[in-house]
Every structure is written in structure tokens, then in C-alpha cells.
UniProtKB/Swiss-Prot annotation:
Binds to sigma F and blocks its ability to form an RNA polymerase holoenzyme (E-sigma F). Phosphorylates SpoIIAA on a serine residue. This phosphorylation may enable SpoIIAA to act as an anti-anti-sigma factor that counteracts SpoIIAB and thus releases sigma F from inhibition. Its EC number is 2.7.11.1. The lineage of its organism: Bacteria, Bacillati, Bacillota, Bacilli, Bacillales. It catalyses: L-seryl-[protein] + ATP = O-phospho-L-seryl-[protein] + ADP + H(+); L-threonyl-[protein] + ATP = O-phospho-L-threonyl-[protein] + ADP + H(+). This is Anti-sigma F factor. Gene3D superfamilies: Histidine kinase-like ATPase, C-terminal domain. Keywords: ATP-binding, Kinase, Nucleotide-binding, Serine/threonine-protein kinase, Sporulation, Transferase. It comes from the Bacteria.
Amino acid sequence: MRNEMHLQFSALSQNESFARVTVAAFVAQLDPTMDELTEIKTVVSEAVTNAIIHGYNNDPNGIVYISVVIEDGVVHLTIKDEGVGIANIEEARQPLFTTKPELERSGMGFTIMENFMDEVVVQSEVNKGTTVYLKKYITKSKALCN
């Protein structure tokens, strides 16, 4: 069965936790493990924070878009902004790379996404925005039977 939800919100840092909890609540219908749910929440936090800080440069007028599609035990997550874009995606995906060292950003966002998700695709165009496509296979819970 297919189920989906779409969310959009202002590019404000306080909305990052809203996005994380909302996506986790939606994905919970698949009965993921706590580790899987934590990984999804972490990835949402990283991608939304990237959109707010890097995509929109903390401009609250920007809008962050999230789509979640659940189908056959797979979570398809899309996080999009219409911000400044990424000039060099390959460089941006390198561990420790950051465009904002003055903010003490770790530069680990994409690395975390790649470690926690089964697939990560980043598409971006300078001055048009960035879209991050993420896929996670949820393992079937093994309930104890008496």
C-alpha cells in the first residue's frame, strides 16, 4: 500500500524539530526499529538544517518542502529548497566540507545522510535550489509469538 504526505514551512531553525517529529510520526506506521526511526529523524534534521542555513542563508522568507512516500516497506523522502543551490555537489558531499566555518558547522551533514540511508541523491542548480532524495528500507519487525 502506498501512503504519502507533503509538508512546507518557513526556513526558520525552530521548524527543524517540527519537521523531524512530523516525518517520524508518519514513518512510524511501518513499525520501524528505534534505530531506524532515529536515523530518519537525524537525516531530516541534517537536510532541513542544510536548507535553512546554506540554501536560504537563514532567510525566514524561504520555504522548505518535504515529501514522504511510503510504499512496500520503503521510505522515500524528498527535502527541497529554492535557495542559492550548490555549485559543486561532489565537494559539498566530502566529509568536513562546510561553506560556513564561522558558524562552527561540522560539514558532516551529507556524510551522515549517506551513512543512515540506503540511497542519497542530491540535485542542485545555483540560484535555483537543492533537492535531496533519500531512500530507506525498513526491516520488518520480528514480533514475539507465544
